Amino acid sequence: MGHETRAASLAAEAYVYGTPLVRGLETVGMLTQDGLGSLPATAFNHFAHAEPATGWPGDEGTLCSLAPLDLSEGPLVLQVPPSGPRYAVYQFVDAWTNDFAYVGLRAGGADGGSWLLAPPGWDGQVPGSVREVIEAPTAVAMLVVRYACVLGDAEDVAAVRELRAGLALHPLTAPGLGRGGLPGGDPLAEPALRFWERLRVWAGDFPPSGADRAYQERFQSLGLLEEGATPYAEPAAELRWALEEGEAAGRAQIEAAAWRWGQDGGEGDGGEGDGAPSGRSAEGGGSAGAVAPAAEGGSRGGWKGAAHLFDFNLDHLGPGTLDAPPWRVADRSEAYLRRAVAARVGLWGPHGYEATTTQTYRDAAGERLDGANAYTLRLPPPPPAHGWALSAYGVPRRPGPEPRAVSDRTPGLVREPDGTVVLRLSARPPRTAAANWVPVPAGPFRAVLRLYVPEAGYRVPGLVRAEPE
């Protein structure tokens, strides 16, 4: 392998490693400067709330809120309202997209209270009113809040809005100016090398763990460790070629890995992610390893999932996380690749023990799902500890309103005497048990089931083709 080829290979490695930081902070920048999707521009340390008509695509079981966090001026105090038995999660994600802490129904917090969010290395005085200190690995982070909600039920939506009104973020001491935005890098850097300039600047501003900093040393020859003026203004032809080739190769590697995680027997439309912007939610519960086999990609009934896609945080696992082998990728290089895939398909998604999504394109007989037919899904007891939500999407996914989801909170849901829930998936509503009806589009579709803290060993059966009514 020649010198130029080795440099391009190294750049591909750096692209995979740095993509989560760049993609995550670019999205933070979009939210704070221009708005994100239906959310308006939202300053650091303030909340942006999705509404039922404009919620995150693919997460019809919850209402989501985002708060970009800036801890550069010191700690923040997060006030959380009592949420009772309703599923709620407050998920903390660092600049490198690592989930580093959780508060909520699973992790404690249903009674509400105050938490202190501290910047890296902070050792100041903790107020007595604070329940717990959450130290962020980076000075900029993201808080993702989800409340279980029946989006078509005005009363339930109003209850969630009332909960949101009880959310608050304020500085522990007198507020400073804080960040007006993220550093954008040297404007003299060539536009084609913008990714590398952002990676260089942001990796310096938001340094990762010690182990990752040691790993970064290998990228010295690419200019990524340079301080001050950009090395990408007029780079040598060899460096420019290596960076451009490496970016293309690294992107292809991420796309191939994303397909392996999301494919279903070689078919599909790219599926959906687990994160806030891309809409996927994910959980599990109980003890480590307590995730439904179907959520781990088991083939029963064609259900596929990625409960362990978000197991890439190896260095900073704070309150509410599970620091156990089943939830840690043993190989650091594999962790970097999973992190890049997660940033690509499900930015800011949670660990599989906090929630999980599983989907299928086929029925129990192995036939492709099609809206010309009707199907039943029997969810046996015990149900997931904190709920579930089922919806159907056309393949390929079509623009338009999000489909109606049926969840454990749907008013009028009919249960069998033993607690089993029988759901009917069809294009036309059934004559009875209308609350148990999951509408499906005409033509090919996929069914998506979200499980909020499922019990250990909970298995999702296949969809069975039903007789027309």
Model segments located where?
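A compositional/structural signature for long, glycine/proline-rich flexible linkers
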Residues: 1-268, 279, 284-469
